[in-house]
């Protein structure tokens, strides 16, 4: 699943990503990603100082990105794209301790970012006429987490994309993000397709759960998945109190109830985590989950690259004809 929201308040964003708030950094340091990050010499772990600088529209050398003429866009310091693994994948990865599955999720996020960069656009004036230039680079920081707000196992990555990109003339400018958000459905499909291919290469079987390409691991049933969906049950109870089932509720009602019932994301110490994992393992045994699913041989790097390309092609093939034509024309 892919969700996203804009980061519009610089002061609030600074506290949101600080060690004090500890929302993104508490489960491990983030890593720099994207061709734009490479152009700025940003590699490896994310450091808080540079992270805040970039959110504020300043380059590592102190230069400030020129303000955009769009007042609304000027308030956007970046965007948080959150890629969440299917629940059964989270259960296999985090309770069984399957590092290969965790790595598959990370590679699928990278594939999605590579596709996002194809939609990176900046404004440029030529002879007094403003036009859009496809830049092909983004500056992003990826923070991988393992918990839902309800403390269920939930493997997900916050991909924070900064509001900047380098044009062909070497100048850094704010993003013109219309195409990026126009293709979020494609990005989510590409992530799911890549993840499915990587998991199949590991020997896991999957089952599709809808026509949009959502899937779960075949050896973990829906009933077993529900054992690790506390927040989902809270939402169901809230709907019952309103006299509705989930099927009858509108999307807005579901979103409002989800927000209203979302518990605070508290910090967890090492001991808390050990207790939590022990609890998960006990629940998985009670649910009858068998983690020792047979797996085939792991593919090499070349197979991974081919799987990534095939996954994106698969996602594109399932879009509308208009979207596919737009992508092919780039």
Each model region followed by its residue ranges:
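Intrinsically disordered, flexible peripheral segments
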Residues: 1-314, 319-323, 327-329
